[in-house]
Structures are given as structure tokens and as C-alpha cells.
Amino acid sequence: MTSIDNRPLPFIYQFTAGAIAGVSELLVMYPLDVVKTRMQLQVTTKGHPAVVAAKAAVDHYTGVMDCLTKIVKKEGFSHLYKGITSPILMEAPKRAIKFSGNDTFQTFYKKIFPTPNGEMTQKIAIYSGASAGAVEAFVVAPFELVKIRLQDVNSQFKTPIEVVKNSVVKGGVLSLFNGLEATIWRHVLWNAGYFGIIFQIRKLLPAAKTSTEKTRNDLIAGAIGGTVGCLLNTPFDVVKSRIQRSSGPLRKYNWSLPSVLLVYREEGFKALYKGFAPKVMRLAPGGGLLLVVFTNVMDFFREVKYGKKQ
């Protein structure tokens, strides 16, 4: 029976483990991210039935499988991975902030909200996750903008460099941070839900005494945490996608809250959860996969640094 190994490791090990976990999850789940973006950018049409039918016939996606099938048939299998270069490049800093940043903020909030023996509480878990999410947003926003513009079905861009050049020429370097405010909302809410729920679920599950039991708990907690995170942040993810797709001085979608209200008024409440199914299908199991890979890579690094635990 293998006991759980919690020996501490320096930041560089956490950084590397987070990057490996993030890229592993990305390679497996990325097609669902493309589907999510396509569905979020799809505007619900209102008006005369004939007009609605005509517009719906043009690349209208009715669900996850319908979208996957149409992308493969019309554009080719490779388009399920369109825009993946940008998220791969941002995975290392993104995951480093998500995990090590969360740990750093936990230490900070434990000083503000002292607990007996420095124990964790759900409040600290939520605050730490939200704070790490806010910092994370500043890192990922430009990469997200590039990814969204490449994933768009109407995109004329072929490479990330084309997107960057076009954005900088038209709007300057700061235009790469278009949608930053919406990205902050998205990451704050998701991380708060994810880490807050993981903390609570781990308390409810039977205490893990072996590495196998820890993997089981991580899968369950990560999947539930990922689902809750999606429920909280999808409306802001929808408007983020639309804000980042647009360019130029006159844009329909600008700030998050007015954009959420605009989507609600024009398309109804359901439109705020467009792409929810592929998002949950990715981030629920993906959240579990992320924790499992991260934990196992960290255990491997501990063996390399300290030797096998007796």
C-alpha cells in the first residue's frame, strides 16, 4: 500500500507540473473548446420565420455532435484543433498562476482570516481561487483573443501571428487586451467555484490513505468543481467570446455587464449559456484530469528530488 507523499517542492517543480497537466488536458479536450466558441458566437435570430430559417441554414449548430460533424465534414478534422498554438503557449504561465498563485494567496488570506492551527476554510479557498483567477486573466487575455479569432467560423486568419499583426496595426498593442474585463470575470468566478468546491468535496469524501484513493478523490472533486465553475462563469464566457471576436472603434459588445444584459434582451436567458454543454464536457472531466496529472507529476518530482518515500 502506497502512502500519500506531501513533501514540499520548489516553485519550478510546481510550474513544470502545472504546465504538463495543462497541456495534457488541452490536447485531449481542445475540440470541445472549438465547439464551445462556435456555439457562443452564434447569434440567436429573431424575426420572420423565413428569415430565421434562412440564417439558421448557414453554419447553424444545434448541438455538440452536430457542430463536431459539420466542422469535420466542411472544414476537415484539423479544424477541431484550429487556434491551439495560442493556448499551448499560455498553458505554462496559466497553470503556474492557477496552482502556485492559489497556494500563495492561501498563505496571504490565512494571515487576514486567522484559523486554529492555520487550517483552511472554504472562505479562504474561495478568496484564494478568485484572486489567482484575477491575476491569471491578465496573462491569458491576449492568448484568448488570438484563439477566439482563429476559432471563429468566419475567420480569415490562418496563423496566430496574422491575428497579432492585424490587431496591433489597427488598434495598437493594448488592443490585444480587448475583453480583459470579461476575462477577469470569467476566471474569478470559475476559480472561486472550482477551488471552493474542491475544498468542500474533499472534506465530504472519505479521507484518502493511498495514492489510488487520492486519485479517486481528485477526479471526483475536480469534476464537480469544474461543473460548478462552468455554471458560475458561462454568461461571462459568452460575452467574452463576442467581445474578443469584434474589432474596431464601433463594437456591439464592449463591457461585460451591459453585454450580458444585451444578450439576455435580444436572445433570451438560454443564450447566456450557449456552449455550456461542450464546456462542461471539457471542464468537468478536464478539471479532474488536471488534478490527477498535476498530482502524479508532483509525486514523480518528489521521488526524483528526495528518493522514493519509504
From Swiss-Prot:
It comes from the Eukaryota. Pfam families: Mito_carr. Solcar repeats lie at residues 9-108, 120-204, 213-300. GO terms for cellular component: mitochondrial inner membrane; mitochondrion. One of its GO terms (biological process) is L-glutamate transmembrane transport. Disulfide bonds: none annotated. The keyword Transmembrane helix applies. InterPro entries: ADT_euk_type (IPR002113), Mit_carrier (IPR002067), Mito_2-oxodicarb_carrier (IPR051752), Mitochondrial_sb/sol_carrier (IPR018108), Mt_carrier_dom_sf (IPR023395). It is a multi-pass membrane protein. Its main location: mitochondrion. The chain crosses the membrane at residues 9-29, 78-97, 126-146, 179-199, 219-239, 281-301. Keywords: Membrane, Mitochondrion, Mitochondrion inner membrane, Repeat, Transmembrane, Transmembrane helix, Transport. One of its GO terms (molecular function) is L-aspartate transmembrane transporter activity. It is found in: Mitochondrion inner membrane. PROSITE patterns: SOLCAR. PANTHER family: MITOCHONDRIAL 2-OXODICARBOXYLATE CARRIER (PTHR46356:SF1). Present with 2840 molecules/cell in log phase SD medium. Belongs to the mitochondrial carrier (TC 2.A.29) family. Transports C5-C7 oxodicarboxylates across the inner membranes of mitochondria. Can transport 2-oxoadipate, 2-oxoglutarate, adipate, glutarate, 2-oxopimelate, oxaloacetate, citrate and malate. The main physiological role is probably to supply 2-oxoadipate and 2-oxoglutarate from the mitochondrial matrix to the cytosol where they are used in the biosynthesis of lysine and glutamate, respectively, and in lysine catabolism. This is Mitochondrial 2-oxodicarboxylate carrier 1. It comes from Saccharomyces cerevisiae (strain ATCC 204508 / S288c) (Baker's yeast). The gene is ODC1.
